[in-house]
Structures are given as structure tokens and as C-alpha cells.
Amino acid sequence: MSYIFTSESVSEGHPDKICDQISDAILDECLESDPNSRVACETLIKNNTVVVAGEITSNANVDYESVARKVVRDIGYIENDLGFASASFEFQNLISEQSKDIDAGISGDTVLGSGDQGLMFGYACKETPELMPLPIALAHKLMLKHAEVRKTKGLGLRPDAKSQVSIEYDSNYQPKRIDSIVLSTQHSDDLDLEDLREIVKTQIIDSCLPEKLLDNETKYLINPAGRFVIGGPVGDCGLTGRKI
């Protein structure tokens, strides 16, 4: 019996993904100067405000605000007309050192305990060179292409976007065909919806998906809800850990 499996990926400008990247960048900065850093950093974004909170014990001297602004700038939130911009967002720092009680429980000369932070889902497989299941590999590929086209060609695309790819598998658990592709992207106010759909189909989707898995029944759902002008942290709250 065949079945359909769907995976989702979001763009670098999606609110949750912005938060992931800020927390990740802060971790990288801490580890670069102090490999023994202990970092539990959460990020929250809404409207034009970025909040970092958590517990960090490190000898590294990290300017959290500068790190956050660089991440946002590199993503492409630069102009204030989006309602969220790297130079103007309000920044709140609620980071403290790790609790001494937790520190005592995980420190030691020989045996180390572990904190309670973990993230587990999924599996490795041989479906793709990335050793990831095909639906998530293709969904990620679409979002990487979206970022490339947006940054090099513009075309009215904005940073916030999401993709879903549904694959039909045969009874031997092998990918049989692509059942459907959903790609929704934020766009400029002056971009016509049909023009947007043509841009996404020709500039992004067509270059990412294997032709052998496409057929006349494959469904392309591009901005199926219609216009998507208000996006990013103005449209949704973002939080670390929901889109890693």
C-alpha cells in the first residue's frame, strides 16, 4: 500500500527561524572564545522587539545585542518599511549566569551530568545525499533557493516564507512521486499575486525538484491563502526551538 509523507521547511526570515539563528549565533560566539561555555539561550521576537533570555556561564565577552542585529541584517530585514529592521528593533537582554544548583549537578572532575535541554526527532536514511528523508531535504532545498533568489534578484520577494513537500511512497517504502508542493512567501505590496506565483514556480520550484518524481497530478500550491505582505515578526511571534 502506498502512502504520502509531508515535511515542512521555513525560510531564514521566518520569525521562529530568526530566533533559532540568533540563539545559535550567540552560542557560536561564546564557544569561539571559551570552548567550555555553557549556553542556554532562548530568543523571542514580536513586532520590532527582540528578547534574549536564559543562562550563560562563559569567560567569553559577547555583545549579545550586536550579534542579534548582525543576524537580522544578514537575513535581510534592513528597511523599516517591513516593520522590523536590524538597526531599529528594541533589544532586551534577560540573560544571567547558570544557577549554582544546576552547576553543582552537572559539574565534576570525572563524571559529568547533563542538563535537561534536548531536541530529538527524525532519523538518518539513504534517500538523499544529505542522509535525510526526501520530503524534508526538498523542503529545505526550496527555502535555500528562495533565499538565493531573494538576495540576488529581489523580484519583490521578502524574507518570511515556508514550504511543504508531500511525497507518495510505494509499498516498499521507496519515493514514488511528488504529490504536492506548497510554498508561501512574503512579498512586496506592489507585486501582483499571479506574477508572484509565476516567479516562485519558474525561479524557485522548477530548479529544485527532480523531474522524474513530477507528473500531471502533482499539485503546486503557491501562496494558496492569497496575498502575504505582512510577515516576519510583525505578522507572527517567533520563538527559539520550534523550527530547528
Predicted regions located by residue number:
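Short glycine-centered, acidic/aromatic-flanked micro-motifs in structured strand/loop junctions
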Residues: 12, 54, 185
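N-terminal, positively charged regions that mediate nucleic acid binding
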Residues: 1-40
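Short, charge-patterned binding micro-sites
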Residues: 40-58
